[in-house]
Amino acid sequence: GXFGKAFXSVSNFAKKHKTA
């Protein structure tokens, strides 16, 4: 669902900014 998409987005964001 949309939640999975959002999670991936957040995961990618964290990777890009090396946060967590």
UniProtKB/Swiss-Prot annotation:
The keyword Secreted applies. Bactericidal against several Gram-positive and Gram-negative bacteria. It is found in: Secreted. Keywords: Antibiotic, Antimicrobial, Secreted. One of its GO terms (cellular component) is extracellular region. One of its GO terms (biological process) is defense response to bacterium. Hemocytes and pharyngeal tissues. This is Styelin-A. Coiled coil: none annotated. The keyword Secreted applies. Its main location: secreted.
